[in-house]
């Protein structure tokens, strides 16, 4: 082996300095572990050379250049007419609005259908991702909270985020429908992320693929029901997904899909959302199969704890319980900054997450047993060996744990 040259020695020295800085940093919080490890996973997906990740990256190749779009036929939806574009064998619709902008008086409330429109709406570009942990409102998610490269043309985060994307090989026929719920816990992510492009699945499987943006973190899961707010405010993000499934039931036939053959599936936080839907009466009958990919078997937050988190947020904003109406007039940045200060609000996956409200989510999806409401739904569950070690990176003892250490904490 040769002796490193001057440039090689400089690189080695720089790496050593970086490593000393890393080791000198204080231990990460649970929420910081989750964010850091999710960023590392996405970076691995982007940089790794193995075939699986190359295939993930290849899904975005068709978006690498600005195209003169060949339009699809106009599709009539229950909200209004839309038109997408053609992409080889596919017809693609991006940024389809399924809900009214959840702002002002609609903030911290279940979603509402949008006002109908009569002019043809172009569905050729991605809708805004939800405001999320670690990303300032208006910024793109790429390289920020979760390291996920934003898809070309994806706008910055916004409260007005209730959009879906649809890929299909044709507007006639009855294809199986697959609705993808993105990862990132309940606080981060986007259905428009580059690695979630649904084109390859629609091409290879001849299914109609749907990806979803929905409210996240404090805007999706702040439970105000015990403080005079909407009883289901703590489930707003999950109720967004229920509204998506209602949209699929009412409209997917016009996109060549079969509303009687709908599968919900998701990975990591998306898998957790699939599990939550199985305990929600509002979702009953809107899907027919479920796939949980590396979904954490975590319990929903108890109502009492969710209420404590809401009180803490009001305190951080200088508001009292009787001031809930003032939440409507605050900026998204003010609310997000206050939420970031509340250590007690960090759910098991980081950030705010669903709670048992007795209405939208009347019981836990796992405890004490499986919900009877979804007993007839076939479920596929997948895991990877040692996958939970993803969340140990950043722990001061990472790399030193013994099996006894881990089992003693189980």
Tell me what each language-model feature is.
Residues 9, 18-23, 44-47:
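Short, intrinsically disordered low-complexity segments enriched in Ser/Thr with adjacent Pro
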Residues 231-253:
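Alpha/beta-hydrolase active-site loop
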Residues 271-283:
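Short glycine-enriched nucleophile-adjacent loop
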Residues 266-269, 281, 294:
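Catalytic nucleophile serine of serine hydrolases
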Residues 183, 236-240, 268-271:
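Active-site loop->helix "elbow" adjoining a glycine-rich segment at hydrolase catalytic centers
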Residues 256-267:
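Alpha/beta-hydrolase fold nucleophile elbow
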Residues 55-235:
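Non-catalytic accessory segments of hydrolases
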Residues 250, 284, 289, 293-409:
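Substrate-access "cap/lid" subdomains that shape
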